[in-house]
């Protein structure tokens, strides 16, 4: 009998710290890593590259079905490869982020990308970073964590990230964009952003990243009975 690889799902809104947590957990456990948000960003970027309308579900489905994407972990960094090109930086722009949120709202697009995401499930295990990993993609995952933080704290973190990269940022505009995106993600008809019924809800608003990692790893090891 073939062993089924265990999955730890980390869901939550943008800016809660999922990416940092997932990389740390994957490194600590030596597991594979899936950044599902990157897949939607890659599809959005591919649509922009190929001049496909991100508001057209019919146009996006064939692109999603044949999306050439893979993840390569190098020295603790996750490289996102689209059609043989490293697009790790390009998919993190605000334009692509906004387009990705639109793309993710289409049922047939999500279905086309579902199989691709599930194919990342391999031994010894998978850390799955996203918004509906525990509710839709891996509903049988033995460990589910929903990482949250206040919209103000997430806007503050995003502002610091952008400022470190040399961008001039308006906090109020950034906060408004995050709230608008939250509202869209939480209230969409397909796979809304909600914690799975059996997920641990972890609020990172007042926690350091080290505290978040410690709590998440402790919970996962208890659930999986790992040393």
UniProtKB/Swiss-Prot annotation:
Give the UniProt keywords, A-Z. ATP-binding, Cytoplasm, Kinase, Nucleotide-binding, Transferase
What the entry lists under Pfam families is as follows: Cytidylate_kin
Q: Does the keyword Nucleotide-binding apply?
A: yes
A biological process term (GO) from this entry: nucleobase-containing small molecule interconversion
Q: Which residues bind ATP?
A: 12-20
What CDD domains does the entry give? Answer: CMPK
Q: Which Gene3D superfamilies does this chain map to? A: P-loop containing nucleotide triphosphate hydrolases
Subcellular location per UniProt equals: Cytoplasm
* Top-rank taxon: Bacteria
Give GO MF terms, alphabetically: (d)CMP kinase activity; ATP binding; CMP kinase activity; dCMP kinase activity; guanosine tetraphosphate binding
Q: What is its main location?
A: cytoplasm
Reaction catalysed by this chain? Answer: CMP + ATP = CDP + ADP; dCMP + ATP = dCDP + ADP
The record's EC number reads 2.7.4.25
Q: Name one GO cellular component term.
A: cytosol
The family line of this record is: Belongs to the cytidylate kinase family. Type 1 subfamily.
What this protein is called in its record is Cytidylate kinase
Source organism per UniProt? Escherichia coli (strain K12)
Lineage of the native species?
Answer: Bacteria, Pseudomonadati, Pseudomonadota, Gammaproteobacteria, Enterobacterales
